């Protein structure tokens, strides 16, 4: 409560431009009393009265941190205030089922900078600061805008696609700018990537996370993103803002100030989703000749488990971007339900899977990625298991 009170008090101080003298005391984030005087000795129009910057944290190793994180840092040296305004969800570590159900909420938090950096230092993730070159009136308005969102609390459903950390920063700054515009470089409009393209490009260090993310993300993330709508990834936001201008001046500093040194990234190693998919495909081909039922049952169990999860996401979950997913064709619980009568439907279903694999591969080669290659190979392995159940193989 003290933190929120301090921030709201500072907002009031920023908005009041008095010519009278009033003695006051406020408390900074270190808990120290700071004597202030409302008089002409405090120049609220000075450019350094409020210092605004963009903070970007290195990617983590789990689903919710694999793309990194971005937040805004606002400082008022005169009054000893220094906060990170970070748009975050409720803790997901022990609430995975709530996450899959779409029950987690999001909100804007005001966190003292030292506390914010300590979290990333503990995780071995670097934090980099880029100064925002904004007019003082915009920086004061930005602080007011952020305070309002902090006061709203954690009230919005978790939505990584429409309310991710990077894209909300864009919205906050645009709101503070008012009629002023961010002039982006023409290169931002030369390409229209999809959300899936952006995730694939920025998760080469975490292939298993990308593999799982493709199961969670439906067709909504496959729509082309135009202009600043594609600034979903923190590092992409940095690159775009380093080339952008406001009032003819560069928006972002070109070189960062390192607040936390990051540790070297560790890749997934040799056992990747692609290796697993190739292994399953080889075993499926070999089992056409071996005729062992154990592999078929193992594949059916895995397909059913994934299929139940996929069906839940599409039909029952409120998680964003799960309304439809092309992976529902190969992954659903229907094969298990009708397994006893498989010789009657196995051949046409194998044909459906073959068409699906061909279509997904063609789309990927064409450049419109809907699934990963590892998913396609895995479905091919499942196709061979289904084909083995046809009258051609069943005696």
What are these regions (language model features)?
Residues 1-7, 395:
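Positively charged n-region of N-terminal signal peptides that target proteins for export
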Residues 8-18:
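Bacterial N-terminal signal peptides
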Residues 20-24:
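Sec/Tat signal peptide C-region and signal peptidase I cleavage site
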Residues 25-36:
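Cleaved targeting-peptide boundary
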Residues 26, 148-337, 344-395:
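Activation targets extended, charge/polar-rich intrinsically disordered C-terminal tails
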Residues 47-124:
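Glycine-rich catalytic cores of cysteine/serine-nucleophile enzymes that process amide/ester linkages
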Residues 60-61, 125-133, 151-160:
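Second-shell loop/turn segments in exported
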Residues 137-148:
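Short, charged, amphipathic alpha-helices and their helix-cap/turn boundaries
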């Amino acid at each position: 409560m003290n933190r929120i009170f301090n921030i709201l008090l500072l907002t009031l101080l920023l908005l009041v431009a008095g010519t009278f003298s009033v003695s006051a005391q406020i408390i900074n984030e270190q808990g120290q009393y700071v004597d202030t005087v409302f008089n002409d000795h405090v120049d609220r129009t000075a450019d350094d009265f409020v210092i605004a910057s963009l903070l970007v944290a290195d990617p983590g190793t789990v689903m919710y941190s694999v793309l990194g994180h971005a937040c805004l840092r606002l400082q008022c040296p005169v009054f000893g205030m220094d906060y990170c305004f970070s748009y975050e969800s409720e803790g997901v570590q022990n609430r995975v089922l709530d996450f899959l159900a779409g029950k987690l909420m999001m909100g804007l938090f005001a966190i003292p900078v030292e506390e914010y950096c300590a979290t990333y230092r503990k995780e071995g993730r670097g934090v980099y600061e880029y100064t925002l070159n904004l007019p003082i009136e915009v920086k004061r308005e930005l602080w007011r805008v952020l305070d309002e969102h902090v006061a709203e609390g954690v009230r919005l459903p978790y939505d990584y696609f429409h309310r991710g950390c990077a894209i909300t920063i864009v919205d906050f700054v645009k709101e503070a700018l008012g009629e002023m515009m961010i002039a982006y470089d023409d290169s931002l409009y030369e390409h229209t990537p999809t959300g899936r393209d952006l995730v694939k490009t920025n998760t080469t260090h975490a292939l298993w996370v990308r593999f799982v993310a493709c199961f969670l993300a439906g067709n909504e993330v496959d729509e082309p993103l135009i202009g600043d709508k594609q600034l979903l990834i923190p590092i992409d936001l940095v690159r775009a803002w380093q080339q952008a201008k406001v009032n003819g001046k560069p928006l972002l500093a070109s070189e960062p100030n390192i607040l936390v040194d990051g540790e070297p990234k560790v890749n997934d190693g040799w056992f990747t989703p692609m290796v697993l998919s190739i292994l399953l495909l080889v075993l499926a081909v070999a089992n056409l000749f071996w005729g062992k039922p154990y592999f078929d049952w193992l594949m059916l169990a895995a397909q059913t488990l994934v299929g139940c999860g996929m069906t839940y996401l599409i039909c029952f979950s409120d998680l964003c971007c799960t309304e439809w997913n092309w992976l529902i064709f190969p992954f659903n619980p229907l094969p298990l339900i009708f397994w006893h009568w498989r010789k009657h439907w196995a051949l046409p279903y194998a044909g459906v899977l073959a068409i699906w694999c061909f279509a997904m591969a063609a789309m990927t080669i064409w450049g419109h990625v809907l699934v990963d290659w590892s998913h396609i190979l895995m479905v091919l392995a499942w196709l061979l298991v289904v084909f083995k159940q046809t009258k051609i193989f069943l005696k």
